[in-house]
Amino acid sequence: MNKPVLVVMAAGMGSRYGGMKQIDPVGPNGQVIVDYSLYDARRAGFETVIFVIKHEIEETFKAAIGDRVSKAMNVKYAFQQLEELPAGYTVPEGRVKPWGTCHAVLAAKDLIDGPFAVINADDYYGPEAFRVMYDYLSTHEDGSYYDYCMVSYLLRNTVSENGSVARGVCVTNPDGTLHSVTERTRIEPYADGVHYTEDGGASWTDLPGDTLVSMNLWGFGKSFLDEAENRFAAWLDANLPTNPLKCEYFLPLVVTELIEEGKAKIQVLRSTDKWYGVTYRQDKPLVVEAIARKTAEGQYPENLWA
């Protein structure tokens, strides 16, 4: 069994943030959020990282992150390009948005030779998540079904005071495996707790603060790549006619199909760490403050890659 590798999705556009938030410094020596994720991942056992980026930001990204991290990890690059579609499909006129998280992972398909974890470049996950993820991937292989996992967080630890966030709301089975994950694209805190809307704010539904949510920290076997690739054309057929410019091929979509078909079980691992991220530019001071505090407490050295 090959050692688990880490896939970092860093090709997103940062539309709500307004800029390349993947490389916006938050640490005392110019570190960005993913520096801390990679430091935690390296301590947990991950030795190889595959960055999924766009060709246009390659040089900037390498200078800001990749070259620095390469002192401590084996760094590889994959490129998520709009034109990477199944035979017979073309990019709709006017489309600039990437095809989503599942498409990002498929961009790295040729570089993945065993189990792998997936993270967002612009989310701070905390050390616990990488420990439980690496341990699981190192000790589980596909058997009569695909044996995957995800790390869940408590909803109250993952909201932004500065606006809405999108989260995958998880329902678990009695044995701790994932029953379903539903993408809620507009979740907001309010005076009495946390709620979400699906109709532009006309009506709201409360969610308990201890609801388990996905932050796109998934653990898969290589089998997932074939499943995702084989389902892509059917997904395009179903979505391009109605939403050609904005539809996205999300990881939870394929996960849900595999669960419903009885092909996969997804163990729900848990982290009680608080999430930090920069969905909005106003979130940045909170992240800077949190990193400074964790550095002062000794959780991280001032220079991560010295």
Task: State where each predicted segment sits.
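Hydrophobic packing residues within well-ordered alpha-helices of enzyme cores
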Residues: 61-65, 133, 287
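Conserved core of the sugar-phosphate nucleotidyltransferase
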Residues: 127-215
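Short beta-strand-to-loop acidic/aromatic patch adjacent to the donor-nucleotide binding site
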Residues: 114-124
